[in-house]
A protein has these predicted regions:
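A glycine-rich beta-to-alpha transition motif near the start of alpha/beta enzyme domains, typified by
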Residues: 1-112, 152-271
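Active-site glycine-rich loop that binds ribose-phosphate moieties when present
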Residues: 2, 122-141, 167-169
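Membrane helix-loop-helix hairpins that form the core translocation module of multi-pass transporters
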Residues: 99-100, 114-123
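Active-site-proximal beta-strand elements of phosphoester/diester hydrolases
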Residues: 117-119, 140-145, 256
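Internal active-site segments that recognize and position negatively charged phosphoryl groups
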Residues: 133-161
């Protein structure tokens, strides 16, 4: 039995545990499955394992609640940046991920919330229709890469349903379809106006989530590329609204949103 120190934080309801990489001792998958369980663990959408390297750099490994490893999480990265701001007073930090380095800068603190601007890389957007088993007709959407894979679908209905299915049901089918070799995150986007979108997220390895930093960026990038919206907009998910700025298709996208430290403690882990 091991005693694992953790911090829990959330960004617009998308919650993560932050654990020192050394504590994982090669047990990342099992630890994520156990500690992220909502009823028998601490409960979280994933774990950010923070590796403090000898050269002073910081690197994050993200494991989803199902134990699978992902390239990065925009919200998870922001949660780590908020923890480093609170615990070490860091106002700007570069965090390495398998999806590239993400630089996070503290903008302000509003009560318990840390508002952080994150440089999210240069999105790549490709319009692509797909055919999925069990779904009638082709699905029109866009493949977007923001350091991890996304498929974005534009919808008209207020409940975000499409092709006769709820967004949750359709998202589950698309996320694991063999067309996507490593699976994909799925977003359902409604354009509300030239400066505003709303969206829902089916996250690879987690299922429906209240928010996603990379999902916010992917949804915004697709809207900016394929719909008539501004290069600066508000993107509203179930858990809250984030601000996205993307000057042009060759520039780095900037994402601004809140993160809040929930608690810290020690967990018993047998694995």
């Amino acid at each position: 039995m091991s005693r694992i120190e953790f911090v829990k934080a959330h960004a617009c309801g998308n919650d993560f545990l932050v654990i020192d990489e050394a504590a994982a001792a090669g047990r990342h998958e099992a630890m994520a499955e156990k500690l992220c369980a909502r009823h028998t663990g601490i409960g979280a959408d994933g774990i950010e394992f923070l590796d403090r390297r000898p050269d002073g750099s910081l690197f994050l490994r993200l494991f989803n609640a199902d134990g699978s490893e992902a390239e990065l999480s925009g919200n998870g990265t922001r949660c780590v940046a908020a923890w480093l701001a609170e615990s070490e007073g860091l106002k700007e930090v570069a965090l390495g991920t398998h999806g590239g380095v993400r630089t996070c800068r503290l903008m302000e603190r509003k009560g318990a919330e840390w508002w952080i601007e994150s440089a999210m890389g240069v999105p790549r957007v490709m319009s692509r229709s797909i055919v999925i088993a069990g779904v009638d007709g082709a699905i029109e959407g866009a493949m977007v890469n923001v350091g991890n894979p996304h498929y974005v679908i534009f919808v008209e209905r207020e409940d975000f349903s499409s092709h006769g299915m709820s967004w949750q049901e359709l998202g589950a089918k698309i996320s694991i379809d063999p067309l996507f070799k490593f699976g994909t995150n799925v977003e359902f986007v409604r354009v509300l106006g030239p400066h505003e979108i709303a969206f829902r997220i089916y996250e690879r390895g987690c299922g429906p989530t209240t928010s996603s930093g990379t999902g916010t960026c992917a949804s915004s990038a697709a809207a900016m590329t394929l719909r008539e919206v501004a290069r600066e907009l508000s993107a509203a998910a179930q858990g809250g609204t984030q601000r996205v700025v993307w000057p042009d298709s060759t520039s780095e996208m900037m994402l601004t949103g809140p993160a809040e430290i929930v608690c810290q403690g020690t967990a018993e882990f047998a694995g």
